């Protein structure tokens, strides 16, 4: 009786082990496909974030923009830069943050324009 019980337990563990291994392989494959789907633009954006020291979300919050439109970014940048002018009682630190945020958003718009141009060229031909 104990022998049969031990065999059942061992078989059950083997089944669970195989199922776990299969699920793990599927998860790795899905992760790889998702990473490839994000493409190079996500990698470039992450690299720019690490170089500039400011994330895209933080830059958008600083300049109070939700969409990356050059006009809105420039308008908010000029306003915040003038308001934080040290000569007018503003903060040089905040002014620096505003400049870094604008630089980061400009870099992101450049990356987006690079990734959208090849797609547009292929649709035109």
Curated annotation (Swiss-Prot):
Keyword set, alphabetical order: Membrane, Mitochondrion, Mitochondrion inner membrane, Protein transport, Translocation, Transport
Residues passing through the membrane, by range: none
Reported function: Regulates ATP-dependent protein translocation into the mitochondrial matrix.
Entry's Gene Ontology BP terms: protein import into mitochondrial matrix
Major localisation: mitochondrion
Protein name: Mitochondrial import inner membrane translocase subunit tim16-A
Family that this chain belongs to: Belongs to the TIM16/PAM16 family.
Region (J-like): 58-110
Organism: Xenopus laevis (African clawed frog)
Subunit structure: Probable component of the PAM complex at least composed of 1 mitochondrial HSP70 protein, 1 GRPE, 1 TIMM44, 1 TIMM16/PAM16 and 1 TIMM14. Associates with the TIM23 complex.
Subcellular localization, as worded in the UniProt entry: Mitochondrion inner membrane
Membrane-protein topology: Peripheral membrane protein
Keyword Mitochondrion: yes
Pfam families: Pam16
One Gene Ontology cellular component: TIM23 mitochondrial import inner membrane translocase complex
Domain remark text: The J-like region, although related to the J domain does not have co-chaperone activity.
